[in-house]
Amino acid sequence: MKTIRFCGHKNIIHTRLIQAREAHLLSQQQLAAKLQLLEVSIDQQAISKIELDKRIVTDYELMCLCKVLHVKAAWLMGDLD
């Protein structure tokens, strides 16, 4: 299986995901629980892997992360300050 990478990374949101999660005072487990309420099947280990840049993020996961964390996708992807 081919590993997908962009500039050596599996995802481009890992740094800002941590910032947004911590700004909302959420643990990885709490974030996973909020995502599961939106029917996104993601657990604490998956959140950890995303934050450690060891897992890709699907488009629907990105949109749900934005919804739960109240941020724009462009910000999460590093386009906006």
Regions found by a protein language model. Give the residues of each.
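A detector for short, charged/polar N-terminal pre-domain segments
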Residues: 1-13
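Residue-level signal for the short linker/turn that defines the boundary of a DNA-recognition helix
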Residues: 12-15, 25-26, 42, 57-60
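Short basic helix-loop element that most often maps to the first helix and adjoining turn
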Residues: 15-37
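Conserved hydrophobic/aromatic packing and binding residues within compact polymer-binding modules
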Residues: 17, 31-32, 47-50, 76
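Recognition helix of helix-turn-helix/homeodomain-like DNA-binding domains
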Residues: 37-57
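DNA major-groove recognition helix of helix-turn-helix/homeodomain DNA-binding modules
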Residues: 54-75
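Short amphipathic recognition helices of helix-turn-helix/homeodomain-type DNA-binding modules
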Residues: 75-81
